[in-house]
Design a protein with these regions (language model features):
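A conserved regulatory-domain signal marking ACT and ACT-like small-molecule sensing domains
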Residues: 2-205
Length: 205
């Protein structure tokens, strides 16, 4: 691809890599299949660079800086990850289209959708089909929980007790008192022992 096209694709490649990294961390275990769905305007872009960027993000969660745009496809193949690609130009969920990555593996299926807004900002727009509006950041905490009183307050208090500062928070749900997701952007990484305490909170899955 020409340098001009690659420059135009730059925010879309960043989104694909970011979404790949996020969905990999949510999936846990061994990922056997990655499905990349390009919707709306995204479907009109060359797909191969987006596939490679998504794989780079997906694999970098476990392999770090050793994964790059040159070896991402080879590493995915070596690990037996099947790659599926779907294009849907008719989708009009966002003006600039969207990109969804779904993984399937040992611990089930997880999906994250993102979009590039007009000003070039990257946004996460859904997690496992729960609607959110999240700007990706360096340190994020995701929870899947029951939509019931007390859980958000309990988690916020727990983070405060451990001097973890919350920069922003988003909650997505489909029905009242059903399941929900919460996304917190925080200033620092969460220690492993605190993460274990969080997962033990009643109502957090």
């Amino acid at each position: 691809l020409s340098a001009e096209i690659m420059e135009r694709l730059k925010p879309h490649l960043q989104l694909a890599e970011t979404v790949g990294l996020l969905v990999s961390q949510l999936a846990g275990g061994h990922v056997k299949e990655m499905e990349l769905r390009l919707q709306g305007e995204f479907a009109s872009h060359p797909s191969q660079p987006l596939v490679i960027a998504a794989l780079k993000g997906l694999l970098s969660a476990g392999l770090g800086d050793s994964i790059n745009f040159v070896n991402a496809s080879l590493e995915a193949k070596a690990r037996g990850i099947q790659v599926l690609e779907v294009k849907d130009e008719s989708s009009r969920d966002f003006a600039g289209g969207s990109l969804q990555i779904t993984t399937r593996g040992d611990q089930g299926s997880r999906s994250v959708t993102g979009a590039v807004f007009a000003d070039g900002d990257l946004r996460i727009t859904s997690i496992d089909a729960f609607p959110v509006n999240v700007t990706p950041s360096s340190h994020m905490l995701f929870t899947r929980h029951r939509d019931m009183p007390g859980i958000i307050g309990h988690l916020g208090s727990l983070l405060g007790e451990h001097n973890v500062n919350i920069a922003s928070m988003q909650v997505g749900r489909k029905i009242v008192r059903g399941d929900a997701v919460m996304v917190l952007s925080i200033d620092d990484p969460i220690p492993a022992d605190l993460l274990q305490t969080i997962t033990a909170i009643e109502g957090i899955q």
